[in-house]
C-alpha cells in the first residue's frame, strides 16, 4: 500500500512535469513557426525588388559576329548610368 502511495505521488509529479514540457515544446514550436513565416515573407519582398534588377550587374551588348550577344560585366564609375538593354535586329542564318 505504501508503494502505491509513492508511485501515485511520482505519477502526479511526472504528469505535471510532462505537461510543463509539452507546454514549453508547443510554445517553442509556435515561436519557431512565426519566425519562419517572417523569414519567408522578408525573402519574398526582397525577391520582388531584386527580380526587377539586372542579375549580377550584367549588361547585354548588341550582336556582332565577333561577340555573339555576349554578356559583359558592367562596372559603374563616377555617377554613370548603365547602358540600356539592346537587342540586335539582325538574326544569324
Swiss-Prot record:
Cellular compartments annotated: Host membrane
UniProt keyword Membrane, yes or no: yes
UniProt entry tagged with the keyword Kinase: no
Glycosylation sites recorded in the entry for this protein: 78
Entry GO CC: host cell membrane; membrane
Disulfide-bonded cysteines: none
Segments crossing the lipid bilayer: 20-40
Highest taxon listed in the record's lineage: Viruses
Bilayer disposition of the protein: Single-pass membrane protein
Main subcellular location: host cell
Keywords tagged on the record: Glycoprotein, Host membrane, Membrane, Transmembrane, Transmembrane helix
Family: Belongs to the asfivirus KP93L family.
Leftover remarks: Encoded by inverted terminal repeats (ITR) sequences.
Protein name, as recorded: Uncharacterized membrane protein KP93L/DP93R
Biological source species: African swine fever virus (strain Badajoz 1971 Vero-adapted) (Ba71V)
Amino acid at each position: 500500500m505504501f508503494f502505491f502511495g509513492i508511485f501515485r505521488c511520482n505519477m502526479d509529479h511526472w504528469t505535471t512535469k510532462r505537461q510543463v514540457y509539452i507546454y514549453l515544446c508547443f510554445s517553442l514550436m509556435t515561436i519557431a513557426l512565426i519566425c519562419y513565416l517572417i523569414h519567408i515573407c522578408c525573402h519574398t519582398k526582397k525577391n520582388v525588388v531584386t527580380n526587377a534588377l539586372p542579375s549580377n550587374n550584367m549588361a547585354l551588348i548588341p550582336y556582332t559576329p565577333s561577340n555573339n550577344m555576349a554578356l559583359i560585366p558592367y562596372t559603374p564609375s563616377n555617377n554613370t548610368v548603365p547602358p540600356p538593354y539592346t537587342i540586335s535586329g539582325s538574326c544569324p542564318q
